[in-house]
Amino acid sequence: MTIRLHDTNARQIRDFVPLTAGCVSIYLCGATVQAAPHIGHIRSGLNFDIMRRWFAYRGYDVTFIRNVTDIDDKIIAKSAEQGRPWWSIGYENERAFNDGYDALGCLPPTYEPRATGHIPEMIEMMRGLIERGHAYEADGNVYFDVRSLPGYLTLSNQELDDLRQPSGEGETGKRDQRDFAMWKATKPGEPSWETPWGRGRPGWHLECSAMAHKYLGSAFDIHGGGIDLIFPHHENEIAQATAYGDEFAKYWVHNGWVTMSGEKMSKSLGNSVLVSEMVKHWRPIVLRYYLGTPHYRSMIEYSEEALREAESAFARIEGFVQRVTEKTGEVVPPADEVPPAFAEAMDEDLGVPQALAIIHTTVRQGNSALAADDKEAAADRLAEVRAMLGVLGLDPLDPHWAGEGDRGEDLHGVVDTLVRLVLDQRQSARARKDWAAADAIRDQLNQSGLVIEDSPAGPRWTLGPR
């Protein structure tokens, strides 16, 4: 079946037809590194990580670009406020973003270009736009002439005459107040670069148009980002690129927000939950399940209750994986192919919720096989489950998650040793038929969040839901 994606520009789900057979090129607007990431930022990267994994499973050669905006007004303002170099703020937060992506199991991009490393490409694009009559210089600034492009605002489905001047775009010398800055003239104390029009720094929109052109050429398959980027950022990217002569992106794919009390999670609103704090209290694989299993276009309302539900749901999957592994005495490899129903769900606009239902159904079938002592059927179901989980980046037996890193593996070993000591005491109580003492030990372990299961091979423990 053909992969189908919701194209924001077409306002419908379309068949994906690559520009080059067997290849897919994706540009994702990545981090603006003025602060450490919250889970809303990481959700976007995670959604597109699932997309690239599915394309790879379907046999595509994937080129995935995720940029870093390492210079903008907020970074400069924070630099002045903290008395630190602008670049040190950017590098520190870029590392925090990459730590967050890695913690939640996102594969590294093919390239992750920084805006400040591509000033020559931006200058070349501005020169071309000025020559074509789509841009002009005024007082050291370079503006895009929005009235020069008839198709402007098609992506966001707006009318130019209804458009208000964007906030923060009150620079002098504009022909039309709706024209947007591609290059901002230098100001005292701000970083700047030399151009034919004087020293200055790039505007946000120019950066992505220039970097997408450099790494993916004049035409590429998919441009992605959060829905808040549709206007003005993506609209202005399209304007610059198409006026420059590029075909630019064939499909526009946007993910929903993480919200809190109905409002978008945002640094500026002060309602953000940092990834670095979340991973102290929740297993990263549970966070990935929580953020990655709703449909990418839906909103996720943040709550502790929803996280606990995700934790419980994943525990059922993980428990099945552990039980079959113990029963068979070996690590069952993933199947070569996912079940057809799972593939059908993923092909239809990355229908992860529907695909997840197939996983849970397969887990139930596997548990029934275990109950019937049918090891072969249980192993077959586990192979299917692992194949499906692998596509979603959620296979608990994947090396990335096995022990959840060295620190997690060490901690698990310490906890296992301590629990085994307590379980030995329980076994001794059972051996002398002191059932009250044995039950009391089990109850205390349960109250600590551990689930104890008695099996012919002896007691085993797992983490229970919170």
From Swiss-Prot:
The positions annotated for binding Zn(2+) are 29, 208, 233, 237
- EC code(s) of this entry: 6.1.1.16
Sites binding ATP sit at 267
Family affiliation: Belongs to the class-I aminoacyl-tRNA synthetase family.
**Which cofactor does the UniProt annotation name?**
Zn(2+)
A molecular function (GO) held by this record is: zinc ion binding
Locus of motif 'KMSKS' region: 264-268
What are the record's GO terms for cellular component? cytosol
Q: What biological processes does GO assign it?
A: cysteinyl-tRNA aminoacylation
Where is this protein found? Cytoplasm
Q: Which UniProt keywords apply?
A: Aminoacyl-tRNA synthetase, ATP-binding, Cytoplasm, Ligase, Metal-binding, Nucleotide-binding, Protein biosynthesis, Zinc
* PANTHER family cross-referenced by the UniProt entry: CYSTEINE--TRNA LIGASE (PTHR10890:SF30), CYSTEINYL-TRNA SYNTHETASE (PTHR10890)
Residues spanned by motif 'HIGH' region: 31-41
Which Pfam family, just one, is annotated for this protein?
Answer: DALR_2
The free-text note explaining how the cofactor binds reads:
Binds 1 zinc ion per subunit.
The protein, known as: Cysteine--tRNA ligase
Keyword Aminoacyl-tRNA synthetase, does the record have it? Answer: yes
Q: How does it assemble?
A: Monomer.
Question: Does the keyword field hold Transcription regulation?
Answer: no
Q: Which reaction does it catalyse?
A: tRNA(Cys) + L-cysteine + ATP = L-cysteinyl-tRNA(Cys) + AMP + diphosphate
